Amino acid sequence: MRYQVKFREDALKEWQKLDKAIQQQFAKKLKKCCDNPHIPSAKLRGIKDCYKIKLRASGFRLVYQVIDEQLIIAVVAVGKRERSDVYNLASERMR
């Protein structure tokens, strides 16, 4: 079963502001997640059904929610890890 990637409207705006090289790196990792989105080491505590993708070199993070019933990976937030901003933003959006 292959999952489909969808963006929340606000996450899409964040995505479009990213440098093309960073978008490509995230796209490559998201493509891998389409086959197996439930990666135990990437699971976020405190936010239900959410996982992260890390780009260590640039410090960017992408937070996505897995919706198994519809086979969807919903991108919740994209941003820098600094001060856990992207995780706090994702947590707010999931409420």
Curated annotation (Swiss-Prot):
Any Pfam family matching the protein: ParE_toxin
Keywords of this entry: Plasmid, Toxin-antitoxin system
Record has Protein biosynthesis as a keyword: no
InterPro entries according to UniProt: RelE/ParE_toxin, RelE/ParE_toxin_dom_sf
Disulphides: none
Role noted for this protein: Toxic component of a type II toxin-antitoxin (TA) system.
Family: Belongs to the RelE toxin family.
Descriptive protein name: Putative RelE-like toxin protein
